[in-house]
Each structure stands twice: as structure tokens, then as C-alpha cells.
Amino acid sequence: MAILINKKTKVICQGFTGSQGTFHSEQAIAYGTNMVGGVTPGKGGHTHLNLPVYNTVHEAKAKTGANASVIYVPPGFAADSILEAIDAKIEVVVCITEGIPVLDMIKVKRALIGSKTRLIGPNCPGVITPGECKIGIMPGHIHKIGDIGIVSRSGTLTYEAVAQTTAAGLGQSTCVGIGGDPVNGTSFVDCIEMFLQDDETKAIIMIGEIGGSAEEDAADFIKQSKIKKPIVSFIAGITAPADKRMGHAGAIISGGKGSAEDKVEVLQSAGVIITRSPADIGKTMLDLLNKI
């Protein structure tokens, strides 16, 4: 079953004919993703990568039945692209773009309320259900069909968790990069809830980082959840020096809250197993499952 996407998901690409849209659409098609077309305003009626190009998301959905979209659009235009997909009632929208202005994302966040759209990102690697559907920039070959659900604020650390669970023979059910920006569409809580309810997901890896309260919110949810599954977490930034700017816009410790140690403590109190090194994520999960 997995979560969010599967082999039946029909995907369009916004920013389809640009360099990034072209390259990553080629990779998705090669992986087996059911790409059905793309959107580039002004280029409707043409074909690209042997797929139809449309001027609008509305037209693309009407002609192809698409229920998912991936956005490779520059930061100044990305929010409008998300809003267009929301207006077209696309079910899953994955925005890869980094650097979208916060005020633009606040407008998007408001538009998501009561909509039919689930936004993944922005500033994220995307989402993949191994062997079925790849939407985003992650390397497909490191994934393996399995039963570990992975959710992460960091793209490259997601790949570490994937490579290690693949090497351990565990594989993944679905991997979701929720993005590193302060305002995003889908949270740890959203993904953990879906993984807990998914019969194909036996355990969960959650990769967090300093800044914000997403990990604390997840810990509260895990405590209160009636469904229990093994969860391993790594929090990036434990050794981050004070007053130093880090990589993600959301990696800001403010008001004495959002530190890595605070997050570790609250997650441990919820029964989550913490690994202190990203190199031990796969081993920690394998050891935990062997004890059950």
C-alpha cells in the first residue's frame, strides 16, 4: 500500500521543459514513474520527452487525469505554481524549489487549508515509493522495496538512511523529504500518522534537525498515538556551534527552543530510539527490529 504515491499515480511536471524539469523527468520516466505530461506556459501543444506539454495545470489534469505534480520552477514563481496546482485540485504536489520567500509560502499555507491538495516541500528531495513511483531528485538506484518508512527534513541524510536500510536488507515502503524551510506543506506528524496506519510499513526512521518545533510536535503525537511501531531518529545539529548560520532556512534556534538536545530528550521520552551518528541509522534500526 505504501503512502502518498504508488504505481498508479499519474504525474505531471510544472516547469517541464526547463533544464531541471527535463533532467529529473527523464530520471523519473527511466525509474518507471507514470509521467503523463508537463506544464510550461506558452509551450502548450508541443511534445517534450515524448509527452504532451500544456499551458496550464487545469488543462493538463483535464487531458491526462493527473493526480500528482512535481514543481521545478524558480523561487520567484514557485508559489504561484503551487497555488495553480491547488486550484486544479491536484492531490499530491511536490515542490523541489529552494529559496521561496516566506511570505509567498504563508499564502500557500493558507490556500492549503480546506483544499484537496497535500503539499510535500518546498526545498525537499521529494517522495518515492521504491519500485513504483519516484517524484523528485533522489537517486532511484539506492532504494529497495521493503517495509521501513522514512521521513526527513534533510535530503542528503534521507539518502544515507535509504542506503543503510537497503544495505541491511530492510528496504523502504515510502521515503518522504518534507523539506528544510520554516513554512512547508507536510509535517513529521502528518507522515508518521500515515506510516502508522500503513500495513506495509513495519517501522519508521525520522531524521530531524535543529530549529523549529516539528520534532517536538512529532514526539507529542507519538506519545498519544494508539498505534505503536518501532521508531528510530537522528537529529542533525547536536554539535552545531551557537550563533552560526546553518544550511536550512528552518534550522534556527530561537528563544532557547529548538536545540538538538531538547529534541533528543523529548523524542526519547516518547519511546523513540535515538542514534547519535548518521552512520548508525541502518544498524540501529536493524538491531531494534531483531530485538522485537
Curated annotation (Swiss-Prot):
It holds the Pfam family CoA_binding. Keywords: Ligase, Nucleotide-binding, Tricarboxylic acid cycle. GO terms for cellular component: succinate-CoA ligase complex (ADP-forming). CoA binds at T17, G18, S19, Q20, K43, I96, T97, E98. InterPro entries: Cit_synth/succinyl-CoA_lig_AS (IPR017440), Citrt_syn/SCS-alpha_CS (IPR033847), CoA-bd (IPR003781), CoA_lig_alpha (IPR005810), NAD(P)-bd_dom_sf (IPR036291), SUCC_ACL_C (IPR005811), Succinyl-CoA_synth-like (IPR016102). One of its GO terms (molecular function) is succinate-CoA ligase (ADP-forming) activity. It catalyses: succinate + ATP + CoA = succinyl-CoA + ADP + phosphate; GTP + succinate + CoA = succinyl-CoA + GDP + phosphate. The active site is at H248. PROSITE patterns: SUCCINYL_COA_LIG_1, SUCCINYL_COA_LIG_2. Its EC number is 6.2.1.5. GO terms for biological process: tricarboxylic acid cycle. Pathway: Carbohydrate metabolism; tricarboxylic acid cycle; succinate from succinyl-CoA (ligase route): step 1/1. It comes from the Bacteria. Substrate binds at Y159. Heterotetramer of two alpha and two beta subunits. Belongs to the succinate/malate CoA ligase alpha subunit family. Succinyl-CoA synthetase functions in the citric acid cycle (TCA), coupling the hydrolysis of succinyl-CoA to the synthesis of either ATP or GTP and thus represents the only step of substrate-level phosphorylation in the TCA. The alpha subunit of the enzyme binds the substrates coenzyme A and phosphate, while succinate binding and nucleotide specificity is provided by the beta subunit. This is Succinate--CoA ligase [ADP-forming] subunit alpha. It comes from Rickettsia prowazekii (strain Madrid E).
